[in-house]
Amino acid sequence: MIVPGSKLPAFKTVANVSIEKGKEFADVSSADYPGKWLVIYTYPKDFTFICPTEIVDFDKKLSAFADRDAVVLGGSTDNEHSHLAWRKDHADLKGLKHALLYFGPQLIADLGIAHPTAGVALRATIIVDPDGIVRYAAANDLDVGRNVDEVLRVLDGLQTGELCACNWKKGEETISAQLKKAV
């Protein structure tokens, strides 16, 4: 799996961005978001049970990510047409406001997020800073959904530029990374 400190591999893919006829698809590239934080999440498959709970929670919290100057991109190894069909079929997904990307074989290999036996992407979360450096990467087993509030907490911590203790929350004291001289 890609690790913190790595440069995000450049990518270009197709995404489902709407269910409106004629506006369903768009090309999405890692270069489309200069100066922004990226929160990239992958899920195993469309037309499943845990995945929509995560997608909907990310979507409900888009404004919280935007307040942190972060763009959310989700997706799976299913293509953009599958994403569209699923969104049209699933009531909770019809009004999504963020893109669902096609994570093809090369992209999931480059990110190191391919499940070793199932032929799908892991439930991975990757946070990338405005310089294109991966600052956080985590993956859950296929059977356990992630916690979007924890993704926000980690993003907050990364954006402080300081050391953040276990269970730290935005607004709490950080540990200064600067050594202080004794007077």
Residue map of PLM features:
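Chalcogenol-based redox active-site neighborhoods
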Residues: M1-V183
